[in-house]
Amino acid sequence: VEEFKDREFIQIDTPWGKPSDNILKTKYNNKEIYFLPRHGRGHLISPSKINFRANIDALKQLGVTDIVSVSAVGSLKEDLPPGKFVIVDQFIDRTFARSKTFFDDEIVAHVSMAHPTSSGLMNSCEQAIKKENIEYQRGGTYIVMEGPQFSTLAESNLYRSWNADVIGMTNMPEAKLAREAEIRYASVSMITDFDCWHPDHENVDVQQVIKVLLDNAKKA
């Protein structure tokens, strides 16, 4: 985001509290865009402590109609090595300590999550990734774990048996809340490691994850 010269930081309050950080307002290709770091600047907020409802509500207040989520993930498949991107189209929600709906107090609402991402936004993400010559896969299932700990070997092998593609900690309930708020959503997952299942690679190492994450950030 440092490359954007015309920058304004906006502070927003919501009925759900404050979002993770002030929201950056800028322009790209003459279009107004917003950026919100879900972990806060400096990466200070644990996945379980992210105020997802405030984040989505703040973006809704700003008139945001489309969200492109970018996140670091572990790979659950041999053909998805570190450095590759996955344009996710499905999720399996394994979180348990997060507020997951706007409709939990004196009102009930149901929304379909059969197809949680926007195909149109996925097309836009794919075009941008192709333009940068980044290796990627279109489509894939993202296991969302609670964290902040990484998987046990048994958990990693279980998720592989489910034919999931990647594992991370942040896209739920984000995608569910975006759907409730009627905001189109797409997810680009940047692979940093092989989780802990791969016999020829070491278990998840924070320093190695950070190294690949920084490389992926340059691509993004």
Give the label of every model feature segment:
Residues 120, 124-135, 219:
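Generic non-transmembrane alpha-helical segments
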Residues 1-113:
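Metabolite-binding pocket within alpha/beta catalytic cores that recognizes anionic/polar moieties
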Residues 74, 91-92, 141-146, 173, ...:
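Glycine-rich beta-alpha junction loops
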Residues 196-220:
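His/Asp/Glu-rich mid-to-C-terminal helical/loop segments that flank catalytic regions of hydrolases
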Residues 153-194:
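A C-terminal functional module that forms or caps the active site or interfaces directly
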Residues 128-165:
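Active-site/ligand-binding-proximal alpha/beta "capping" segment
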Residues 35-37, 67-71, 87, 136-139, ...:
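General beta-strand structural signal in soluble alpha/beta enzymes
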Residues 84-89, 184-187, 203-206:
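Short, hinge-like loop/turn segments at secondary-structure boundaries
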